[in-house]
Design a protein with these regions (language model features):
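Bacterial N-terminal signal peptides
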Residues: 10-22
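Hydrophobic small-molecule pocket/channel-lining residues, especially in calycin-type beta-barrels
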Residues: 26-206
Length: 206
């Protein structure tokens, strides 16, 4: 499965090999060489409960760029619901999504796994049509913002993938995916999702 197929899994989920802090810096500041970008470093903060806020049921609105890194300006919209629950006493989070869009109905899932040694999360995605997990993005939360990265190929080109979780409140959250084909100098956002909590289902402490 190539990165476009992997990306399709993410693009249908609201949410992926170790966190690459230098890559994160490149996303904010300037490009780095390939050798510097692949240097790993582990987080030190205990982030086991970072995804507790996400537990519950949500209304989900998704916008997906039709053809990433092609200067495409065509966006496709989806709407659905997302259910999130804890497993492994909070060291893993299981997300299940159902949504509808121009291509019809789909079902997907994300398994978020916490590594107690590196203090980082891996975000693993799949959908019911493939039955396989895509390449995970791995990272952590800092100051209320989650950043997760991986390195893949798209149409024969090496790219970086960045997945950001931000604007977190008790009742809403934003997810954003972007690709870079220039070593992290610039990023093109190709997927945006906003979740709004469904209060009558169950609350964040469930």
């Amino acid at each position: 499965m190539n990165v476009r197929e992997h990306a399709s899994l993410r693009l249908l989920l609201c949410g992926s090999v170790i966190l690459l802090p230098v890559l994160a810096a490149a996303a904010r500041d300037k490009p780095e060489t390939s050798s510097s970008i692949i240097q790993p470093a582990a987080a030190t903060r205990d982030g086991q409960h970072d995804f507790d806020f996400e537990v519950g049921s949500w209304k989900t609105k998704i916008e997906r760029l039709a053809h990433p890194l092609t200067r495409s300006t065509t966006w496709i919209k989806y709407e659905g619901t997302t259910d999130v629950r804890k497993v492994w006493n909070g060291r893993a989070i299981l997300l299940e999504l159902e949504a509808d869009g121009p291509t019809g109905h789909f079902e997907g899932l994300s398994l978020r796994l916490y590594n107690p040694e590196s203090h980082q999360w891996s975000l693993n995605f799949s959908n019911s049509s493939t039955g396989t997990l895509g390449v995970p993005t791995i990272g952590e939360f800092r100051n209320g913002r989650g950043e997760f990265f991986d390195q893949e190929t798209l149409d024969g080109r090496a790219i970086f993938v960045r997945f950001v979780i931000s604007d977190i409140t008790a009742d809403s959250v934003r997810f954003e995916q972007a690709f870079s084909d220039d070593g992290g100098k610039t990023w093109e956002v190709n997927w945006i999702a906003t979740d709004t909590r469904i209060r009558h289902e169950y609350g964040p402490s469930h």
